[in-house]
Regions:
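Structured secondary-structure scaffolds
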Residues: 1-171
Length: 171
């Protein structure tokens, strides 16, 4: 799994480098300490976080954040932990709701969300983050192709609602 992406938007990877050495920052407090700056929530996002640098007292070299961001699936896969801020806080909620009884998504999420949830959770806790998975299929058109706005083969929900009522859309 390629964890990093070379994109502008995304979760900044918390690694700073002077070209030869790397420092992994583990918390906002640690970043404030090494940079000597009081940070705001906005400072933790691009482009502001890329402006946070510091000079190493021993070598005089400047540390800058590496430009990559994390793959968006990492954020999704970290959900069981991130939603409570666990392990820094939220232990009671985490223990109460982990692992989830079930998760549900369309079948195309097998490679994305289901996998990253499982990969991160087994790496961190040694166990699956969910007990059951419910996979939904895709809604197909008259030619048995997946309906897609980009293909232009969707049925407009308001037309179905007006012609057949809300129950036809509720499933």
């Amino acid at each position: 799994w390629a964890l990093s992406r070379e994109r502008y938007w995304g979760t900044p990877i918390p690694i700073w480098s002077d070209g030869d050495n790397y420092v992994v920052i583990g918390s906002v407090e640690e970043l404030e300490k090494v940079s000597g700056k009081k940070l705001t929530k906005e400072d933790l996002h691009r482009p502001y976080i890329d402006e946070i640098t510091w000079t190493d007292a021993k070598t005089g070299s400047e540390f800058k954040r590496v430009p990559e961001v994390m793959d968006c699936w990492f954020d999704s896969g970290a959900m069981p932990y991130a939603q409570w801020g666990y392990p820094v806080r939220g232990e009671e909620q985490f223990q109460k709701y982990f692992p989830a009884d079930f998760i549900t998504e369309a079948i195309d999420q097998t490679r994305g969300w289901f996998y990253t949830l499982l990969a991160i959770s087994t790496m961190v806790s040694g166990q699956a983050p969910y007990r059951n998975v419910i996979c939904l299929g895709h809604v197909l058109d008259a030619n048995v192709e997946k309906m897609s706005k980009s293909k232009g083969n969707i049925v407009a929900p308001d037309e179905v609602f007006n012609a057949h009522g809300a129950d036809a859309i509720r499933w």
